[in-house]
Design a protein with these regions (language model features):
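Short beta-strand/loop segment that forms part of the nucleotide-sugar
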Residues: 32-41, 60-62
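Cell-envelope/extracellular polymer assembly enzymes that use nucleotide-activated donors
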Residues: 3-5, 34
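Short, acidic, metal-binding catalytic loop of nucleotide-sugar glycosyltransferases
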Residues: 22-32
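A recurrent flexible, glycine/aromatic-enriched loop bordering the glycosyltransferase active site
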Residues: 139-144, 150-176, 183, 190-191
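A conserved acidic beta->alpha catalytic loop
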Residues: 23, 39-48, 64
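Conserved donor NDP-sugar-binding/catalytic core segment of glycosyltransferases
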Residues: 92-142
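Short aromatic/hydrophobic "clamp" motif used to bind/position activated sugar donors
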Residues: 84
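Glycine-rich, basic loop-to-helix element that forms the pyrophosphate-binding segment
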Residues: 61-79, 89
Length: 191
């Protein structure tokens, strides 16, 4: 069984994969992870391009588009690893990005999921809108992230470099203990 599997769900994202997958393959495989692309019934050239340009990437072929949650649920039935990262196809990763996540999870067996800080691809000094630095719920039930509240995105000045408990981790870069994911029944297919 692999230690870490990085799984990217794709639907007609040939150009996006061609742009962002090189960093994922390079820096994930360097840290011993296995990279998967779960194709959600694409009708573009995604699968042919992946086979031709990324031979080390493991392909999971789903016959039709099952959406985000069910697409991942079906794909992860075909993955055996201690940890799985659900990673959006438009994420560029950096060297050793998996190391602190795996080290944290190894040391905290009570934790089922975590996430890295996510910075904007276009403006690397700012947080990304999707997930930023961990999710919370305010006292009125409104979800927000460290680094992004409503439409305001903060500059990353190291203010969120500490590890803290979060209420939710973003699906854009969700690092999960696969056994816990399966025990919980996976993602809710209604979303």
């Amino acid at each position: 069984m692999d230690k870490i599997a990085v799984v990217i769900l794709n639907w007609n994202g040939c150009d996006m994969l061609r742009s962002f997958l090189p960093s994922v393959v390079r820096f994930s495989e360097a840290d011993g992870a296995v990279v998967y692309v779960a194709d959600n019934g694409s009708t573009d050239a995604s699968v042919a391009m992946l086979r031709r340009e990324f031979p080390s990437v493991h392909l999971i072929l789903l016959e039709e588009n099952h959406g985000f949650a069910d697409g991942y649920n079906l794909a992860l039935k075909q993955v055996e690893a201690e940890y799985v990262v659900l990673l959006n196809s438009d994420v560029e990763v950096t060297e050793h990005w998996l190391v602190p996540l795996a080290e944290y999870m190894d040391a905290h067996l009570e934790t089922a999921a975590c996430q890295p800080k996510i910075r904007s691809w276009r403006n690397k000094g700012q947080f990304e809108y999707a997930g930023a630095a961990g999710g919370f719920i305010d006292r009125y039930g409104y979800p927000f992230c460290r680094g992004r509240i409503m439409g305001v995105v903060e500059e990353d000045k190291g203010q969120y470099d500490t590890v803290i408990p979060i209420f939710w981790a973003t699906g854009a870069a969700l690092f999960i203990r696969l056994a816990d994911y399966r025990e919980a029944g996976g993602l809710d297919g209604r979303f």
